[in-house]
Structures are given as structure tokens and as C-alpha cells.
């Protein structure tokens, strides 16, 4: 195998959107074109019992939302495609943000009837911060939606990114006729047996259709006042190519996929803690753990560490360094994924995502290297939780299951764990309420450990250096605790309590995470 050629083939991207914009549906259609599933359109089939391929966890099937990030791989048109399907629900932003550290591009799915929504904006900010390319898919043209020009304007005004339409809708909803493909200079037809027609045939096909007349006017306006197409600006994350289509009816998706693969970047390098970039074509293997998932197969109570390969080639059985612990590990049981199905892998290269069976060796953010290389990649973002709950085992006889469940789910990063300094009570912190619900559901379903949870409300969290800590700093306005790394942390009742503390101890430095 020529490793350089293999790396060049890789296209690794995440799909981001607000809940219900159609992200899971478009994922299914892409897998359908990749030959990974026989039948697309099984998303949210609650009555029929068919569920989206990427929504594999029990609670996701019940609710019809993605709460973990799935990893799926397929080959198409000479490229090896790695899709990371991220949770659309806002409470799972932590897992999503970390996943966005492991990709080279993002596909942003927008509901054309609703435009840019809150969660899309949040996720876009992370992608923009990383400077990776964003490709936009305006979805649900099979329903009535907003004017295409308004949608482009929203991209520029709300997200602050220039846009270039690759195609343009001819009508919408019941009046939807197809797409005027500006990039390929052809018509893509929604109805009839023929899929494509030449632009010259447009007048003959659509006659005096008012929507087609409108399209011609819009395109004239875009040619005069729109942005110029620039591959350089796309790769720099400064210009987003915009595709219109309908994932549900599988219209415009294949055109999108083929054009996307043409312009999406090859695997990029990754920055070490000293600021140096590790090149994907370096011969030495390196990678980082961006996600840990327990119980992907409940029958085996397994844990998988998801690793983005940054450089070189993985070979089954290879030994790696784990600089965080100073120890080594052997990568013998490694898989690649199609949501919940998996297959053992013997080789993988930079750009690929592999799953390493984990018995508790790895943590999110770990760097893996080989040979004399002992460097670490820049740390992944960690997030300050906003709401807290006390948690304890309902049945004292189930303490062992309770502790195992908490340990594994916390290592996944699903919730954050704190321990009261004085009472040793367990407290959980989360970005949003849904995280607690998922935690409770999984503790009971996967670990057979019922839990008692009592709300503590919102807290303002700040870390303190161990050498600055004096237990007398604890008061009725704060809770002194330890995080899961045994670092001291204060949970303040509110901003007033934080300011009061800062005034009382002006020399003490308090640290805030993202």
C-alpha cells in the first residue's frame, strides 16, 4: 500500500445542524450512495421500528435525536470518506465540540424554512475558530421555505461568512421543479425520468413557469453582485459553497457529495503543545483520543476510545506511547465503524478514525505516539458545566455497579464529576438538563444501578491552584470540591458570591474553562 496515496484519498468531515434540520437523513443518503445501507430513508421510523443507522443508542432511538457522535466510513468515487455525525441537541455540545477537533471540514445542514438556528450558530463558531472549510446544504426543498436570496443573506449577516451558491432552486414545496446547477452548468430535474438536462433546454422544459423566470432573474443578480467562486477562500473557511436540495426525497444529495469530495481538503496537520505542526505525511504514527464511548455493544460491556490518526500509518499489534502516563500500550484490538456495526481493522492512515478497545487506559484528549516521540498534541477544549445535581446509589447493595457506571460515563465526558471536599458527596455537572436524563437512563439500563438525583441548580465554577487553597475559604456561598483529576474547584452560588470571594482573597487566582 502506498501510504501517501492512501492519505490523499481521505476526506474526514462532521455534519452539524440544529435539531430536526435533517442531519441524520442526509447522513443516511450519503451512506446509501456509499453502498453502506441498502435502503435510505429509515430515519425516525418510530411506528415501523426502523431507526436511523447513526442513531444507535437506546435513548436516541426512543427520542429520535442524536446524543452521541457516531463514526461512519465508506468509499465513493476513489475517496475514503469518514463521516462524524454529531449530536444536534444543544445539551451535547461538549461531545460535539470535541468531535469537531477531529475533522478537516464541516457540512452544515440548514432547514430552508427556518434558516440559521441557535445550535447551528454555536457549532459554526467552533468550526470558524478552527478555520476549517464549511459546506452548506440548504435542506427540505420538498416543503415551502424561505427565499433563497434571504437564506444567503442570513449566512453573511448572522454567521459572518461569504457564500457562493453552487445551484439554485426552481420553485419549492409542491411547486418544486428542480435545480439550476451553476457550477456544472446544467439543470437537475425533480420530476420525470431524466435526471439532467442542458441549460439550453430550460425554456423548452419549463415554458413560462414563473418560478423559472424568477430563477433567471436571481442568477443574473448573483452574477452581477454575488461573491466570486474561490477554492482558496473555501479551504481557508472564508467562503461557504451552498447547495440546495431535499435529503428526504434524496434530491441534490449525490450532486452535493460529488462536488464536496472534489473540494473538501485532504487530512490536515495537528498542533503540538510546543506549537509545532505534525504533518500527516510524517512516517511515524501519531493520533489523539477525541471521544470515549462505553457500551456500544451492551452484551460485552465494552469501551471504545475513538482515535483520529494525525500522521503515518496504524498497523494492528503496534506498540504506542501514552505521554500522559509515561507508559506504553499495544493496539491489537482495533475497529472501524458503521454506527453500531464494526469490523476489525489491520491498517489505517492519517485522516482515518479508529476505535481502540479500552479497559480504562485512555482518557479524552490523550496523545498516542510511537518510538522516541513523546510529544503531546494541544489539549482538547473542556467546558465549564452550568447546572449541577447531587447523585447517589438508590440501593446500597449496588455500590459496585454505581461506581463502575459513574467512572465509565464520566470518562466518556457525558457528564462531569465533582466530589464535595467536606462530605465526599458526588455531584454531577452538565451543560444542559438532557445530559442528566441520559446519565440516569444509561446508569439504569447499562449498569443496572438506579440512582437518586437531586437538583442543585446553576453554579458558577472556578478552579483554584492547590497551593492557594485554604479550606477556610469555603463558606455558605460556595461549595469546595475536587474534580475527577483531584484538582480543587469552587462552585459559587452566583456571580455575586464569586465577586465577594475575589474581593476577600485578591491574591488568589481563579481559573475559568471554556
Swiss-Prot record:
It comes from the Bacteria. GO terms for cellular component: cytosol. CDD domains: RF3, RF3_III. One of its GO terms (molecular function) is translation release factor activity, codon specific. Residues 8-268 form the tr-type G domain. InterPro entries: EF-G-like_DII, EFG_III/V, G_TR_CS, P-loop_NTPase, PrfC, RF3_C, RF3_dom_3_sf, RF3_GTP-bd. Keywords: Cytoplasm, GTP-binding, Nucleotide-binding, Protein biosynthesis. NCBIfam families: prfC (TIGR00503), PRK00741.1 (NF001964), small_GTP (TIGR00231). HAMAP family: Rel_fac_3. Increases the formation of ribosomal termination complexes and stimulates activities of RF-1 and RF-2. It binds guanine nucleotides and has strong preference for UGA stop codons. It may interact directly with the ribosome. The stimulation of RF-1 and RF-2 is significantly reduced by GTP and GDP, but not by GMP. Belongs to the TRAFAC class translation factor GTPase superfamily. Classic translation factor GTPase family. PrfC subfamily. This is Peptide chain release factor 3. It comes from Streptococcus pneumoniae (strain Hungary19A-6).
